[in-house]
Amino acid sequence: MGQKWITLENILVEKLILWGIGLGRDTTGKKVLISWGAIPESVVDIRVLKNRSNRIEGQILRVVKRSPLEARLSEHFQVYGGCRWLPIPHEKQLEMKEQQIREVFIHNPEMVAGATWHPIVASPEVYGYRNKLEFSWWKYISAREGVDDKYRFGFHESGQFDRIVNCTYCVLGDDAVNDIFRAFDAFARENRLPTYDVKTNVGFWRHLVIRRSKKTGETMVIVSVNTLYLGESQREEFKKFLRSFISWIKTITSAYLLHNTGKADIVQGNFEHIAGTPVITEKLFDLEFEISPKSFFQTNTLGAEELYRVTGEMIRTKNPVVFDLYAGTGTIGMVLASRAKEVYSVEIVPEASEDNIRNLAKNNIKNVTVINAPVEKLLEEWKKEGKTPDVIVIDPPRAGMHPDAPGILRDFNPREIIYVSCNPATLARDIPLIAPNGEYRVTDITPVDMFPHTHHIEAVVRMERV
């Protein structure tokens, strides 16, 4: 006998909090947290997933009353997992994101007392801003739902790892990206090779990744397939066929075949360069960056320029020595190099450090030193050596700083600390750890909207020595 779900009816969504979760209340005033697709001022019925002492967690069963904020989208605009806020007007998105950054400090108001809250910086592009998009092929067969769809190509359905929604146009990619997507859709349908089934590990088509430079227009495609489905001679024939097809799409300047034979639904495997140049070039300001299939690069080029502009403007020390921590491929360090005496870029991922070194040489930057090491361990070594920075810039992953890092960082006694955050929750956790006894004070906070139509929000925080 199936599980009998508890439901709650007529829950008003008051607002969206971190991670795009809807906040409402039941008839007793108890908090109700609603995942996936909640829109402020709508009224919904929910299925209760967890009933805790201080909150109820659930998902939407049905919308009883649409939000007055909700835009009526044309069929050209489809809502996928990567753009759940698309029905919400962009001005309202900015307002909600700015409020979320303020609210993460609600339990530590003394940390931001006297700080200047700057208006949120909007992305220069609201649509078509992504320089990288990943599409998936899938088949979805369900006897329970009466579905026998052996070909789907698009994005994962919101909250569903095993379902793909057929895509006709992605508003986060530009027209060239969408043209390439539609061409590959037709190509895959016509050649009749089956889509990959993750449950049986059988099938051929898996993913299509499109990387397109906003500044140069150079475009890379990565075609991810299960090459074990074909025999060796068939694989070679397919590669010839694929090269011929790609040659007709003039916007493609680089192409790779990804031999993806693992069971996990991720873009991994052996990359084989099959056409065009091995890399594409993107620009940030007047700097050039080579992007390979595995390279990390901010997915909103123009938004990244805004983020780094804000970061640079936060630094008030003239000609500083800068520690660039969690440097990734070194974009922040390279942008800051022209106004710094010396930059030390620290990153744990070897491939990212290699990209950094290559791009430094490409741009003839001489005052940046790249160190491939864990941040907390290297800081300990530098402390023993007596190395002293004027400014420390921190750009950690979503998990935030390593627990040992804030205390060590404080021991260097820099004039300024700039924290570039992609996760408001860990930002609010780490800032008090850096200055538990008031050694530093927060002077400036600027939210930056790098990802319109999503719940993601960046923020740059400046701290100065007291």
Predicted segments with their positions:
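Rossmann-like S-adenosyl-L-methionine
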Residues: G2-E9, K15-L18, Y229-V466
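Short, conserved phosphate/pyrophosphate- and ester-handling motifs at nucleotide-, phospho-/glycolipid
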Residues: E41, G173, N300
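Short, acidic/hydrophobic/Gly-rich beta-strand patch recurrent on exposed beta strands
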Residues: G22-T27, G154-E157, I222-S224
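Extended interfacial segments that mediate partner engagement and assembly in macromolecular machines
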Residues: L61-R72, V79-P194, K215
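Short, aliphatic-rich beta-strand segments
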Residues: I210, G217-N226, E288-S292
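Terminal RNA-binding accessory module
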Residues: M1-Q78, K377
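Internal alpha/beta scaffold segment
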Residues: D162-R206, T227-L257
